[in-house]
């Protein structure tokens, strides 16, 4: 009986700590830039990390929480086009892992089906926690929770390592310190 109480107490501490961390994360914006895919500039992107995080390599590897805000620049973009855009983002980061991409296809399609059409200045927020995955919020309403370490890393990499100019702009505040 005592052992059961201890296990319940430990579970409660772990669960409450993750909820507390999510609500009370003090985000610091470290950079912003415009995402491009070919000749298309679909959105501006802002990168924020918790206060005190300064290691660029560890941020890129997904070892720290990250908040990514997208401000859409396109006047109007259909649900299908938004899905194609994110599909290419995933596919580009699975280049060397074609089989892994095929295995993840079902989860990727579920995510893509949740994405709505967009209009200029629509605001999306992706919040990533290493242990919990990535959540998508549109107008402060949770739309989807993307699970799977490889999928989350692929999406993070599509933003953080896609283009050297965008990468340097996203990490500009940290680069100025070093």
State where each predicted segment sits:
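Short, Lys/Arg-enriched N-terminal segments with co-localized hydrophobic residues
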Residues: 1-3
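Sec-dependent signal peptide recognition
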Residues: 5-10
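N-terminal signal peptide c-region/cleavage motif recognized by signal peptidases
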Residues: 16-17
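Terminal leader/tail segments of proteins
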Residues: 21-178
């Amino acid at each position: 009986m005592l052992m059961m109480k201890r296990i319940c107490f430990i579970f409660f501490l772990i669960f409450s700590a993750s909820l507390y961390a999510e609500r009370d994360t003090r985000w610091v914006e470290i950079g912003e830039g415009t995402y491009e895919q070919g000749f298309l500039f679909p959105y501006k992107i802002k990168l924020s990390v918790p206060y005190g995080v300064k290691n660029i390599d560890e941020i890129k590897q997904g070892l720290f929480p990250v908040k990514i805000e997208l401000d859409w620049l396109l006047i109007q973009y259909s649900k299908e086009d938004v899905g194609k855009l994110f599909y290419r983002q995933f596919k580009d980061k699975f280049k060397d892992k074609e089989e892994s991409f095929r295995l993840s296809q079902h989860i990727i399609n579920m995510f893509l089906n949740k994405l709505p059409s967009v209009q200029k200045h629509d605001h999306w927020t992706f919040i990533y926690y290493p242990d919990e995955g990535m959540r998508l919020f549109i107008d402060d309403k949770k739309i989807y929770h993307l699970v799977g370490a490889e999928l989350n890393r692929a999406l993070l990499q599509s933003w953080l390592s896609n283009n050297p100019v965008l990468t340097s702009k996203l990490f500009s505040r940290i680069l100025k310190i070093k």
